[in-house]
Structures are given as C-alpha cells and as structure tokens.
A protein has these predicted regions:
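Cytosolic covalent-transfer regions centered on His/Cys nucleophiles
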Residues: 1-94
C-alpha cells in the first residue's frame, strides 16, 4: 500500500516516458481508502514519478517527503490550504 498513515499517501512509480523526477501534490476534497496501516482515509497525496534508470533520485525524493510528513506542523499547514494558489505559494516557500 502507498497509504502511510495520518491521512497521507505516497504512490510512486518509475516510468520510461520521463527524464526527470516529478512530484505532484494532491489535496483531495473527499478522503479515500489507500489501505493505510492506521486505517485512516487519505486526503493528502504526494505522487512521485521517476525515470526508470534513476533509482537513487527516486529514493531520495521519497525519503525527503517522508521526513516532511513526520512534521505535524507541516501536515497541519497543508490541510489548511484552501486553493491551488495557496498550495503553490506554500511549496514555493518550503
């Protein structure tokens, strides 16, 4: 499962169609089941797409996101963001 708990999921995949790692952040209007270990539905999703030949960068990005989401203040701020402009500005500062 890519559900990591506390309403957060980090689905990740390596694909041949890209040459740089991409991270997408989704703040869902309605939480969904990601089979998280704590059984909580997910409302915050970080999607990682990495090139097939880029194992180290893929793991580094996954590790970085994992570190950020351990910070309760960071997660609380994410949940308070109301629109795409606020999300963009938030990640521009982080």
């Amino acid at each position: 499962s890519t559900g990591v708990g506390n309403g957060i999921a980090i689905p990740h995949s390596k694909i041949s169609l890209i040459d740089k790692t991409k991270v997408l952040f989704l703040k869902l209007k309605s939480a969904v089941d990601f089979s998280a270990p704590d059984k909580k539905d997910v409302d915050l999703v970080f999607v990682i797409l990495a090139p097939k030949n880029c194992q180290s960068e893929h793991l580094l990005v996954l590790s970085s996101i994992s570190s950020f989401i351990k910070n309760k203040s960071f997660v609380e701020k994410l949940r308070k963001l109301k629109n795409s402009k606020e999300i963009y500005n938030f990640f521009g500062q982080t």
